[in-house]
């Protein structure tokens, strides 16, 4: 990867690492690299954001960068990341920009860029944009003047267009379902409850009052306790949790038990296989997916293709193999027939549709997968590469792997967006998984 882009765009503490100057430069560089030169009509970029306070500042800076290069900024306001991806294609825009740090804390922010059709950029394109930002490449020509300067346009119909799009995910009415949705005070605070109500569900929305400061604060897909409590209090059939930009969806059943991205993928894969919609009888998952997913799919006659962690790699494999379902344990679920990236609202609608069509509870559906005990420890480090390559860490990993044998696995993965290394251990016995994960995590934290 390059110097600015991580696994999910450019991120950092807003106004420190991710400054207005950098946002302007990214907007201008994206305009130079991605806008369709020589095409008839004006060049256009779709621009959206989540509700965190710094989004307004960064939006203004990106707009300045876009318009200074002669690209109109089609502003869609506060909408989920998958909405920006969809609208990039729906408006036939040159590219799209989303300002969000997803599940990260409020002080952080990020900039994600989508190419034509709303597809994530490949590494080469990101490197070319970085070269323009960093001055390695000068880019073409002089900047426009007069009528050639880009304009700012508010897309008044953006939300309605997106809601009409996601409605296609519900192929049955959800009139008998009661669902609690935790919107994380994020980008889906309006769209998610509206989408679920339009499909017929009785919706109890929580954490759906964004004020710019409360996004992901003790709520959403990374903090499920409020959702569990609300599901039990309202005796709902299920609960759905989104993150700050709503490209994720996790669930809890009527008992408050977690149904994570792996279990959701199993439920949807079985539904799609039954309907003849699971292309090549194949599911795409990452190396972080639980062994239980692989066992469940094997027994159902479904092949699992494994990628590196990050929905961009899932997307690449889906496109390369023309597959129809993929995702991550974290709740990024991708169905190319319904979107070019993970969409938490689409996932929620598909999951509830399966419940209605089968007459089964979410608990019963999720029981198709037996989750093996999995322990994940995030270790903060100064230098991810140095810590991961340290001899003491390699020794700890080798010893843990030898003890596990064929009954489990260990994975060491540097985060693509944060200064940490993730240590993951799966084993038939939870105590063994906890012990080995703690041993390896200690080796990582003390590595020199």
Curated annotation (Swiss-Prot):
Entry cofactors: Mg(2+)
Entry-linked PROSITE patterns: PGM_PMM (PS00710)
Coiled-coil boundaries: none
Phosphoserine modifications at: 102
InterPro entries: A-D-PHexomutase_a/b/a-I (IPR005844), A-D-PHexomutase_a/b/a-I/II/III (IPR016055), A-D-PHexomutase_a/b/a-II (IPR005845), A-D-PHexomutase_a/b/a-III (IPR005846), A-D-PHexomutase_C (IPR005843), A-D-PHexomutase_C_sf (IPR036900), A-D-PHexomutase_CS (IPR016066), Alpha-D-phosphohexomutase_SF (IPR005841)
Binding site for Mg(2+): 102, 243, 245, 247
Keyword Isomerase recorded: yes
Active-site residues, Swiss-Prot/TrEMBL: 102 (phosphoserine intermediate)
Catalytic activity: alpha-D-glucosamine 1-phosphate = D-glucosamine 6-phosphate
Keywords in alphabetical order: Isomerase, Magnesium, Metal-binding, Phosphoprotein
Gene3D superfamilies given in the database record: Alpha-D-Glucose-1,6-Bisphosphate, subunit A, domain 3, Alpha-D-phosphohexomutase, C-terminal domain
Class of the enzyme per the UniProt entry, highest EC level: isomerase
GO terms (BP aspect): carbohydrate metabolic process; peptidoglycan biosynthetic process; UDP-N-acetylglucosamine biosynthetic process
Record keyword Transcription present: no
Role this protein plays: Catalyzes the conversion of glucosamine-6-phosphate to glucosamine-1-phosphate.
Other facts noted in the record for this chain: Was identified as a high-confidence drug target.
Family: Belongs to the phosphohexose mutase family.
Protein name: Phosphoglucosamine mutase
Natural source organism: Mycobacterium tuberculosis (strain ATCC 25618 / H37Rv)
């Amino acid at each position: 990867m390059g110097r600015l882009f991580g696994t999910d765009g450019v991120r950092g503490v807003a106004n420190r690492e991710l400054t207005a100057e950098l946002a302007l430069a990214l907007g201008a560089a994206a305009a130079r690299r991605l806008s369709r030169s020589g095409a008839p009509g004006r060049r256009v970029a779709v621009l959206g954001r989540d509700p965190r306070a710094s989004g307004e500042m960064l939006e203004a800076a990106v707009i300045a960068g876009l318009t200074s290069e002669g690209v109109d900024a089609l502003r869609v306001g506060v909408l989920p990341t998958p909405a920006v991806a969809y609208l990039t294609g729906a408006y036939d825009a040159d590219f799209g920009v989303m300002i969000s740090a997803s599940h990260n804390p409020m002080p952080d922010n990020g900039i994600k860029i989508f190419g034509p059709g709303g597809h994530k950029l490949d590494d080469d394109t990101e490197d070319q944009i970085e070269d323009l930002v960093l001055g390695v490449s000068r880019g073409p020509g002089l900047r426009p003047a007069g009528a050639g300067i880009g304009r700012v346009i508010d897309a008044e119909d953006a939300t309605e267009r997106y809601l009409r799009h996601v409605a296609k995910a519900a192929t049955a009415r959800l009139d008998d379902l009661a669902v609690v949705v935790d919107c994380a005070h994020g980008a889906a605070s309006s769209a998610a409850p509206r989408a679920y109500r339009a499909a017929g569900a009785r919706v109890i929305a929580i954490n759906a009052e964004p004020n710019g400061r409360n996004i992901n604060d003790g709520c959403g897909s990374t903090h499920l306790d409020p959702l569990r409590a609300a599901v039990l209090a309202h005796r709902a059939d299920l609960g759905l949790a989104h993150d700050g930009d709503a490209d994720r969806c996790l669930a809890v059943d009527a008992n408050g038990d977690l149904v994570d991205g792996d279990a959701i993928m199993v439920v949807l894969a079985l539904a799609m296989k039954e309907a003849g919609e699971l292309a090549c009888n194949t599911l795409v998952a990452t190396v972080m997916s639980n062994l239980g997913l692989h066992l469940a799919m094997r027994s159902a006659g479904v092949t699992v293709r494994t990628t590196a962690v990050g929905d961009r790699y899932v997307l690449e494999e889906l496109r390369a193999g023309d597959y129809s379902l993929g995702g991550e344990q974290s709740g990024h679920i991708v169905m190319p027939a319904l979107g070019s990236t993970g969409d938490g609202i689409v996932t929620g609608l598909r999951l509830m549709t399966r419940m209605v069509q089968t007459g089964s509870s979410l608990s019963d559906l999720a029981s198709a997968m037996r989750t093996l005990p999995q322990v994940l420890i995030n270790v903060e480090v100064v230098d991810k590469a140095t810590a991961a390559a340290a001899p003491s860490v390699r020794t700890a990993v080798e010893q843990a792997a030898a003890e596990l044998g064929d009954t489990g696995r260990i994975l060491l993965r540097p985060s693509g967006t944060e200064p940490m290394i993730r240590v993951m251990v799966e084993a038939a016995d939870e105590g063994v998984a906890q012990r080995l994960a703690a041993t390896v995590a200690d080796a990582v934290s003390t590595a020199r």
